[in-house]
Amino acid sequence: MADTTILDTTCSSTLAANVEFSHATDSAIGISLKNATITEAEGVPNLKETGYDCVRYMGTCNGGQIYLGRERKKLKDYVAIKKFAIDDVDDYAAIAKESSNLRLMHHPNIIELCECFVYERSIYQITPAMNLGSLFDIVFEYMKWGINEKSAAAITRQLLDALSYLHQRRYIHRDLKPKHILIDSSGNVKLSGFRFMIELNHHLDCVFEFDAHLQNQLYYLAPEVLAQNIHGYTSKSDIYMLGISICEAINGVMPFGELEPLEMLHRKLNGQVPRPVDMISLKDDQKMGLDISHRPQEHLTRRFSKEMHEFIANCLDYDPQQRGSASDLKSSAWLGSKIHKNLGPVDVRQELNLDYAHFDLSLWEQEPLIPMEPDQKYEIVFDYSPIS
């Protein structure tokens, strides 16, 4: 049985990438092992023998480098190319695990793998180029005070489609956050970050595992995950992470982000629930004696719907049994309302209202300076053929 894993990457660069690596054992899925030459001046690998052109270096992410590329047979199709050095057995295993997870996924709102191969001691992963980057990128770079309600609803609807698909197959994502929500200029939303996905046991609807690497996601994790008690946690923990992520996108800041981890843990385990920041929630804060004078005018004057407040409150309910399922939330009062019922990718594009000409990947294209290289000897260790 093939051990395949997807590596997801979202980063604060114009190009957001997520790619899958497949590590073959005894199936048709496999690895192509070759030697690569990298231009020191440009940092651009020569991948022509693999069927891809690296257009230019874009940035770093998760210990790897990201390049904008194209498939040579389809010159109009841009891809994200990620390069990871294989210096650590644990890193290699983590990449393999993630690739294995993503291989199992076939959904329009989940990032897909195009191909993956190994050069010397580096893994290259190929995914579609999501040219707006991540939801985190969009908020951080262009929407300091957060996105509007309609764009939040349109994005949430696509995310719930992805989560419904996962949860119906008894998987828990466990790493949902704005950096793993990728968007393209057509308004398509794709969930990435599948390294920590876990499958529920056939006899239990909960799990008890707490991967050590999850400590990097503490601020997004549900109280029951942080508690690490005998009750375990279920797919409803993903719903909590969805609520935190939408709150962050709407408010422009990560909930609990100003707190030290121990204080954040204390507040979550004692039932404190973040809220969307608008004139209603700020008036409530003022009644409690809190100072709101430092709040920006954008927060003081905007007003979100009661239905949206209730939706996020339900996602962030301390009791996981009280949270709606992904399927139920799609027909909630907020997303089922006349205004939000039929939202789709076009609404994401319209409501974000960005200058999309700025995200035209052809503007980033340049002729990479690839040095002359000696004849390279390489061996195709396994044939690569995608699983349908």
From Swiss-Prot:
The record's note on quaternary structure and interaction partners says: Interacts with sad-1. Interacts with par-4.
Q: Please state what is observed when this gene is inactivated.
A: Ectopic expression of pre-synaptic reporter snb-1-GFP in ASI sensory neurons. Along the dorsal nerve cord of DD motoneurons, pre-synaptic puncta appear diffuse or smaller and synapse localization of sad-1 is disrupted. Germline hyperplasia and loss of aak-2 phosphorylation during dauer development. During neuroblast division, daughter cell size asymmetry in the Q.p division is defective. Animals are slightly stiff but with active locomotion. In par-4 (it33) mutants, causes embryonic lethality.
What is the name attached to this protein's record? STE20-related kinase adapter protein strd-1
One GO MF term attached to the UniProt entry: ATP binding
Protein localization: Perikaryon; Nucleus; Cell projection, Dendrite; Cell projection, Axon
Q: What is the effect of changing G243S?
A: In rr92; germline hyperplasia during dauer development
Q: Which UniProt keywords apply?
A: ATP-binding, Cell projection, Cytoplasm, Neurogenesis, Nucleotide-binding, Nucleus, Synapse
Role summary = Pseudokinase which may act as an adapter for kinases sad-1 and par-4 and thereby is involved in several developmental processes. Regulates cell-autonomously both neuronal polarity and synaptic organization when bound to sad-1. Required for sad-1 localization to synapses. Required to establish germline stem cell (GSC) quiescence during dauer development, to promote cell shedding during embryogenesis and to control asymmetric cell division of the Q.p neuroblast lineage, probably when bound to par-4. May be involved in maintaining the integrity of the early embryonic cortex when bound to par-4.
Record-stated family: Belongs to the protein kinase superfamily. STE Ser/Thr protein kinase family. STE20 subfamily.
Q: Name which cysteines form disulfide bonds.
A: none
Choose one Gene Ontology CC annotation of this protein and give it: nucleus
Location (main, coarse): other
List, alphabetically, the InterPro entries matched. Kinase-like_dom_sf, Prot_kinase_dom, STRAD_A/B-like
Q: Which residues make up the binding site for ATP? A: M58, G59, T60, C61, N62, G63, G64, Q65, I66, K82
GO BP annotations listed: asymmetric neuroblast division; establishment or maintenance of cell polarity; maintenance of dauer; MAPK cascade; negative regulation of apoptotic process involved in development; positive regulation of peptidyl-threonine phosphorylation; protein localization to synapse; synapse organization
Q: Residues in domain Protein kinase?
A: 52-335
Check the record and name the SUPFAM superfamilies matching this protein.
Answer: Protein kinase-like (PK-like) (SSF56112)
Q: What is known of its domains?
A: The protein kinase domain is predicted to be catalytically inactive.
Among Pfam families, the record links this protein to: Pkinase
Q: What domain of life does the native source organism fall in? A: Eukaryota
Tissue-level expression: Expressed in nervous system, pharynx and excretory canal. Expressed in germline.
